Amino acid sequence: GALAELASKLKQTVLISHSQSGSFPLAAALIDPAGIAGMVLIEPGACPAAYTRDQIIALSRVPALVIFGDHLGDTPTGIPGFSWQTAFDGCQTFIERVKDAGGNAEMLHLPAKDIHGNSHMLMQDNNNLEIAGLILQWIETNAGKRKESHGTH
C-alpha cells in the first residue's frame, strides 16, 4: 500500500510507528522499500514472527530501530494473553533474524541506557525530548547512511 507509495513519493523517508501501528513500516518495506531510509518502531504491539526467510532478507535492506521503555512486566494491557514483555521478546527475536540476514536492526531498551520511568506513551513522558534525541541520533547515524548511498541528501 498507501504507506509504501507515500514513502516512494517522498523519497528516503524514515517511517515512525507506535504501538498497534508498529508493523505498518515493516509491511510498507515489504511492498516497496525504495523510498524508506529507515524504520523506528516505538513500543510496537508485535514484531511478527511469521516472516519467511525471504521477507526477513527484504526487511534487512532497511535499517530498523525498535524502542521499549521499562514497564514491560507491570502494565496491564487489557488484552487477554498479551504482555509488553511478550512484544519485547518477539521484537528481540525479529532483530536477531534481521541481523542474521545481514541487516541493521537494533533494540533501544531504555533501561539499558539508564533511562527509567517511561510509560507506553514515550512521546508524552517527561523525558520525551531525551528519547527524541536518541531517535534523531539513530536516524542520523543509520538512516542517513542509506540516504547517502543513494546519492541524495
What are the roles of these predicted feature ranges?
Residues 34-48:
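A conserved short beta-strand
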Residues 115-117, 121-153:
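Catalytic active-site module of serine/aspartate enzymes centered on a nucleophile-bearing elbow/loop
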Residues 15-16, 39:
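Conserved alpha/beta-hydrolase fold motif
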Residues 44-110:
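The feature captures the conserved acid-bearing segment of alpha/beta-hydrolase catalytic domains
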Residues 8, 17, 57-60:
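Extracellular/periplasmic catalytic domains that process cell-envelope and extracellular macromolecules
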Residues 16-25:
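Gly/Ala-rich beta-loop-alpha elbow adjacent to hydrolase catalytic centers
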Residues 27-31:
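Active-site signature of alpha/beta-hydrolase-fold catalytic machinery across serine-
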Residues 1-14:
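Conserved acidic catalytic loop of the alpha/beta-hydrolase fold
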